[in-house]
Each structure stands twice: as C-alpha cells, then as structure tokens.
C-alpha cells in the first residue's frame, strides 16, 4: 500500500471525508468474531473503510456518505471466493463465466486454466487472462503446473519450468500462483523438473502452490506437504481430509457437477468445528445449468448447512478460509487485494442476503463496492472485447485435428478378463473390473486430436489397411467401460481431461464413428441410429462456447434429456461422466491414446 493510498484510507476511516456508500441496518456476518451482529459498513473507492456495530460503537457516530443503502435488516456477508476451479469446465469464456457466477455471490475465482493450456499452451492462458480483465469480479489465474498432466501425455502443448519463468517475467503479476500439482510421482521422486516448477511459484504474487493429491497418505503425503503445496481438493472421505489437515494443508471441500464430496466430508467438521478454519470450498468443475439453477459457492454453503454446519462457519469457509489459504487476507498491501471478511482495509466484496439458507441467489452482490448483481440478474458491466482478445480467440478456433478413421477402428471384440473402467457416479475416481463377459459393458475410445495421428498417418502408418487402424495403441486407445449405460447410440466429446483428446462411448461401432465425425471443431455430441440428436458446440479450443451461459445451459438441458432417453441414468452425468474417463492422475483405471492405464501402478493394463 502506498503512503498516498494509506492516508486516503485513514482519512475515510476516521470520517474526515465522506465515503461513497454506507450500508445501514445490516446484520453483519462477522467471520473473524464468528457471529452475526447489527451495524453499518462504510465503503470508499471500492474498499471497506469502516465497520460500526450497534451499541458498542454508538458513541462513534456515523459516516457521511454519498449513497446510503438501507439493508432493512438483511444479512451483509463477505463475497465468496471459489478456491479452485476450471472456467473451461463451464464451457464458457472467462468474461461470460464472471457474469454467471457474480449472480450467485462469487466475487473472487482462483482459476486454474490448465484445460486450455493443454490445447493451446501459454497463448491459451493469455486469452483467459485478457478476457477475464473485462469482468468486474476478480479472477486470479494460477499457472498450470502440469501441462501435460503426465510427461508422456498426448496433449497439445508442453509448459516447462523455464517457460513458466519466462512468462512470469514477461507478464509480471498476471499469474497469481502455481496451479494444482498433479504429477504425484514427480513430487515423490523429487524429479528436478517438477521441483523447478514448484520453485517457480516464488515469482508469483502469492508464492503459493495448489495441490491435487487423491488418496495420498503416509510418507508420500509427508513429501507432498514438505514440498510447500498448500491445499488439496481431492479428498473424498473424512479420514483422508484429516490426514491432509494434520500435515498443515488446507482442505477444499469440493461441490461441483461431477464430484459431490462436501456432505461426505462434513463429519470431520461436525466432530470438531475448529477444523473449519483450515477448510474452504471449491467447485472445480461446474456446468452452467447447475450454476444457474442451484448456484456455485452459495450451493456449497447450502449443502454444508444442510449437513449440520453452522451458517456463519459455512460463510467463513466460503470467504475468510480461502483468503487465508492464498494470503489474501492480511498485510500492508493494496487494500483492493485484501479480502475474505467485512473489515476495514478489505476489498468491498459484499453480499446482501435475505436469509442464511442460500435457497436462492443473493439479493445484491457488490464487487469492489460496485453493484454487479441483483436477485440473480447481472447488472454490472462487461468491457468490450478488444483487438488483442479477439486475435487470441481466433487462434483457438480450428483446434481439432483428427486422423482419417474407418469403421474397422471402432469395431473390436471384448477379451474375457481384460481391464474395464468401472464408473463411480458422482465421483471423479473410477474402479477397475475384470469381467468374464461383455454383458453390461460399452466400448470406449480415446482419439488423439492435436495432430500427431494426422502426421503419422501421412507417413504411412496405416499401410494398405483400413484408415486409422495403424494408429491403434499409439494415438487411438480402445477399451471397455461398465456403468456408462448408453443404449442405441454413442456420445463423443472434445473434452477429455486433461489433454482433451476426443473421447467416445457407445454400444455400437457405427454410431461411435458417426459421433466422432460429428464433433467437428469441438463440443459434445450425442448420436442415435446414425443421427445427431443433441449437440453443444464448443468452438474455442474445443472447450468453450462463444454463447452465453444461458445458451449453454439450454443446450446442456436438451442434451441431458436426450441422454437420459438413451439409458444414461442418474446419478451419472453423461457429460461430466465421459470427460473425466481419460484423466490419468486420479485412480483407478483410465483410457489413454495408448490404451487402458492403471493410475495406481502407472502401467498399462491388459
């Protein structure tokens, strides 16, 4: 904080100059004092400069203000901070994402854009940063730490420690910290490149490294925490979360679209509520239809409260705990950077709530003192797209480069006892089965789409055989999945975490081929009897739509109806279900372009 800014804040805090906005008759959610108390809050230049509690501070008088907002007894809470998320998973660009989440009370998003980085490298990250600048809420971008997710993954880019350091030097302050460290073997083995990437975080404003450690325990967890990784959002049972808390890590309780872990983890907090101070919320991956209908971090608060967690504690986890995890809550710094509580010297990110049930969107949402949403409607401003953003967006189009494929590639037999992915609905983890028959199974394929297969095919990989058959086991993985009950057709997507190759699941070869052909330049496609019955176009990198959140939500809802009619039953989400099946950093069995991969042993499974 400069001396000039400090003096300005002090003058306003002392009441010697008028403030911009004074919130009166509020029930203030005090996350420091863990209480709700009546009072008023003064804001000047986007910063909270004064908090006066009724009774205790009556002798202090009040603030002169340009605008007085009578809260009429409503609750005034700090804006929510989403501790870990992937904007691309909502299938919309950053400015549109900000418009969507602001209506639900998210005023800060800690975004890891490793999805677009796996497709377009650092140019993809630059697009996210520049497009995000158009938004009134605060988006803090983390540098993707694992592009690709594993060293030999067939992604569209590679980002090394040296690349990170060069980007930090060229774009100082644009990247907040280092994103989730998914290369667990690299950490455990003290791999020099992995360690260099972790060390690169020291060039960022937060100097923090986010984590990703599903089922990690014992000495491996000790090594992970000792490396300086501050948080994890992958815990699925209380014992796992407590292991991480006890090693000094923050635990993010995830409540997304595919993964619903919060209720399962809540017993750890009910057993000892003091643990909540080191716990926060993350959505990770959230579909627009869910965001618009049930919310984002406000939804996590509701789930927590329904599980028995005190509302003030839930709000604290949604704000202060996350701010503390990333060092955003204290220090003699620019007050526009400090947040997580209603207290002097903090950014004026505020929620005006009718009650503390979170059954609906906040009555009003303020970001840096400016009204951005009211009763679920965005009323803020999104800046126009400038030439640089438009140019970066244009580079993300036409990202799907698939080889030529014949029907023979999709038509293969089941081998009794072979490794089969066992879907776990509502969870990112999968199981591994070895059934003796194909009853109840569906074919699954992963086709590299970043140009490797195209190049190898041009070199004669297929020989005189059917198109694409020479790529099987190299750039086309084939296998079987149980629990993905699509009937009479196929589903395909250009989203396949984290390298985003084309994944297709179906019960017959012809529809699987038709679905892959229909993917075009990106999106989700549902094919039945050779016809496309539902589609969500994702032109930007094959990950993001150029439409609104409402457009994508409507397409998603139609897709869901058609998918349910084809036998994909709840609780399995057909889209979130398929896009995580290739993810090679979460146990147990996954599909890669080379074949079926056992994450627990890091070997290919026959």
Locations of regions flagged by a protein language model:
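Active-site beta-loop-alpha junctions enriched in small/polar residues
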Residues: 86-88, 114-116, 144-149, 180-185, ...
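Active-site microenvironment of metallo-dependent hydrolases
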Residues: 1-39, 44, 103, 292-308, ...
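Divalent-metal coordination cores built from histidine and acidic residues
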Residues: 2-4, 9-12, 95-206, 533-535
